[in-house]
Regions:
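Low-complexity, Lys/Gly-biased intrinsically disordered segments
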Residues: 74, 259-292
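Short, intrinsically disordered, charge-balanced linker/junction segments flanking boundaries
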Residues: 198-212, 247, 281, 285-292
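Conserved nucleotide-binding/hydrolysis micro-motifs of P-loop NTPases
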Residues: 76-79, 121-124, 153-154, 170-173, ...
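Conserved S-adenosyl-L-methionine
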Residues: 1-73, 78-80, 89, 95, ...
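Short hydrophobic/aromatic beta-strand or adjacent loop that forms the aromatic wall/cage
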Residues: 160-164, 192, 248
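Short, well-ordered beta-strand micro-motif
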Residues: 166-168, 182, 290
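Conserved Class I SAM-dependent methyltransferase catalytic core
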Residues: 30-37, 52, 95-167
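Non-catalytic DNA-recognition/assembly elements of restriction-modification systems
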Residues: 212-273
Length: 292
């Protein structure tokens, strides 16, 4: 669609292209109200025969054998009390809806399929068995990038910290690394009012993600302060498959043309009291010091 959109945001698809798009777009939702709203939205945008279905992907097998080239999803973050009672076709056994939804989408991509999925932080680092199994499956088969969003981007509806998982099954087979991107501001304040502000990282991060998907690792990415690239072996090292990018940042990475020097060679070190703590003796291992 982006390639067929003019400067004013109007879609310039031909009738045949629009018909092909309409025939290949599908949507599922468990809520009949959301299905009706989605159908009306499609009608208003000129799609006379939209394929939006009332369907529970977690407990029904009716459409299990349907696959997609591209999936975009913002699944529910919360599981109902008592958990989900899913069918037994999932590769990861869990009663947590956030685990099952991601599993479902990863399993229902075609061999060259791609997906963008918004997930709560539990998917990123929870240590439960199902979470680790899910992350292992994603790292080994489909995950190519993780975009960390600031807490509050969904205010006032939810203050949950979220990330976006980028899946690309074809690319995942060709590369042995995963890129992590950090968005600090999306152009709006993170309070309940979400007022527009000047700082907006999204255009830059979007460009970096595209470069990663098109070109792989290069100097600009490697040295960017909000990008971390980790090997799959590194992520799998302790069996946790943690998807927090900062965990893999090289603390010794030097983005400078100057040599490292010892602090004591260029400044007088004076151990002092700090934050109400007791006096720290200087033993060449002082972490917090004042310098002159």
């Amino acid at each position: 669609l982006q390639a067929s959109t003019d400067e004013r945001g109007n879609v310039t698809l031909t009738p045949d292209e629009r018909a092909s798009l309409a025939a290949n777009l599908k949507g599922y939702d468990i809520s009949p109200d959301m299905v009706r709203l989605s159908l009306v939205n499609m009608y208003l945008h000129g799609f006379s025969d939209p394929h939006i279905y009332e369907y529970d992907t977690l407990t029904s097998l009716e459409r299990w054998n349907e696959y997609a080239d591209v999936i975009l999803a913002n699944p529910p973050f919360m599981s109902p009390k008592g958990g989900i009672r899913p069918h037994n076709r999932f590769s990861v056994q869990s009663k947590r809806s956030e685990v099952l939804f991601v599993d479902y989408m990863a399993e229902h991509l075609t061999p060259a399929g791609r997906a963008g999925i918004i997930v709560p932080e539990g998917i990123i680092f929870q240590s439960g068995t199902a979470y680790k199994q899910l992350r292992k499956m994603l790292v080994e088969n489909a995950l190519v990038a993780v975009i960390s969003l600031p807490a509050g981007v969904f205010n006032p509806y939810s203050g949950v910290k979220t990330s976006i998982l980028i899946l690309d099954k074809a690319r995942a087979k060709k590369v042995d690394s995963i890129a992590f991107f950090k968005v600090e501001s999306d152009g709006f304040g993170l309070g309940a009012q979400r007022r527009e502000i000047e700082q907006n990282d999204l255009p830059e991060i979007l460009g970096l993600v595209r470069e990663w998907l098109d070109l792989g690792i290069h100097e600009k990415l490697a040295e960017h302060p909000r990008v971390v690239v980790a090997s799959k072996a590194q992520i799998a090292e302790n069996g946790e498959y943690n998807l927090s990018g900062e965990r893999y940042r090289n603390a010794e990475l030097r983005i400078t043309n100057y040599e490292w020097v010892k602090l004591g060679d260029i400044a007088l070190v004076k151990p002092q009291y700090g934050s109400g703590a007791s006096k720290v003796p200087y033993d060449n291992k002082v972490r917090y010091v004042r310098i002159t």
